[in-house]
């Protein structure tokens, strides 16, 4: 009898009805599809470059790791305002949404200009940081050359990427997840087509190798930006915030202050987290160019599978954020519990598939056997820890939806710099431990974050309406 009551209580707390899951999937699936197609094409892009040679693949992957830091800077810059956007939309305050959009615009412009200047001045030095491990002088020189070629072209794609993030994030926070997905699909088709034409020189197109891959990516970003921006302004009946959006670019000082208070820790968090990921890769790269190549393969494959917990985490921010904005705290807590449980269960199933298929993926690349073998085991280790990452991602967005950005800053980037990076740094430089063991130790350390996240979510420190308070 007692056990039956416990089961009923568990089901009520963590398992929703059909209507609940349909609501969650309506938000999550379009994000999954968009990110899934993007990451799948990135995989194909990666394989196409990988078919040319290991040095070309490694050079492009190092640059992508550096640009990833910029991408997350933009994500962090717009996400601080996005917390307010979701809650303003929950209150049907369209002027509030406009003002948060304008804040996003200025923040993204500042970050983009700063990034372009940084890469133009010290880009070659940044690439060289990843070329200090084992490898011949010729291999290192070739990897640096291809990386520099790739970077110079990719910088042209930062402005359209910036605009896509500003518009798409606002649309999603207002409940429109389908259009960004459609724009992403079109852009991906453009990217894939021109990758094929320009990397290999098909028909009358020149054979440009890594430069062709970069040109294709830049073209696709301009196409995506054109679609998202034009659709938003042609459908003002659906996007009320777009009416008079550019009548002024001023942002009220009081709102700017509020967003900065909540958003600056988030911006620092994303920037520090991304730079920590780049630092972790640099630590692993000490063990040689084969490690750089294998990390590139495994990370690309991992990104395809990670779309599930990433989309469900984004859904937590959107759905729970709107409930908090509407002042329904009880429903927000109940919904959050069920969404976290759903994310972990889904990702456990995905991890099993990923683990079984791990030996097959590296065979798609034209690289040496050692790099393939390393990539296989890196994928397996990541699959093993995927349920843990799903829980962490969902708890992170739970805390962020309630404006607890200082806590998320400590929870995320401070932890990775104070725990994960030192583990990788010390083990890679001062021990002979195999790189796979180092990688697993870094993943295992995140169990500490799981405990912290569980306590914070259970306490309900995130249950607040920040746009009213």
Q: Which stretches of residues belong to each language-model region?
A:
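Hydrophobic/aromatic residues within transmembrane alpha-helices of membrane transport systems
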Residues: 33, 45-49, 60, 85-90, ...
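Small-residue-rich hydrophobic transmembrane alpha-helices
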Residues: 57-117, 161-180, 281, 292-358, ...
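Small-residue hotspots at the loop-to-helix junctions and early N-terminal turns
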Residues: 54-65, 147, 151, 214, ...
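Transmembrane helical elements of multi-pass membrane transporters/channels
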Residues: 26-45, 153, 187, 220-224, ...
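Short alpha-helical transmembrane segments in multi-pass integral membrane proteins
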Residues: 1-28, 85-157, 207-263, 320-385, ...
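Helix-terminus/linker motif at the lipid-water interface of multi-pass membrane proteins
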Residues: 36, 40-58, 127-141, 199-208, ...
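Generic alpha-helical transmembrane segments of integral inner-membrane proteins
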Residues: 32, 36, 40, 44, ...
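Short runs within selected transmembrane alpha-helices of multi-pass transporters and secretion channels
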Residues: 78, 153-172, 180-188, 213-229, ...
